[in-house]
């Protein structure tokens, strides 16, 4: 009789512990990953970035509530071992930890809309573009000074700067220099074709 009572007590205790673990896991799984007082947060993943860099950025921008739980879930889902895709990712307000991990693993990056100001010199143009995009200034300068590359636009380095209008254009944050110049040129052509 006493043995049966002890067994029943242990089974009830086991069920209660199991329920507490399930409730705690559900709480962590369904609770927003970061502060909910902010709107959309943008995470910038540079080419070749490691998980630690992204985790630090998430902590700084999103203020992860449970960083160690997020790290374990990211390891379990394979975010820490797989190479990260570069880009600019939008984390919506109130996103849970699994949603943040899914965005970083599978989502398309959010394009960036840039409106150039009055850019008169090559240095002003390069500084403006490289401050908004993940692009090295020396690679963009090399493309702008390459006369054979500029010939594909029917322009020179000096005349191409005139194609950078004060019109907003949309481009991926991690675009290459060629993609950027193609986008600027197509925006110029669209503007003049009406």
Residue ranges and their predicted role:
Residues 2-194:
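Conserved catalytic or metal-liganding residues and their short signature motifs at active sites
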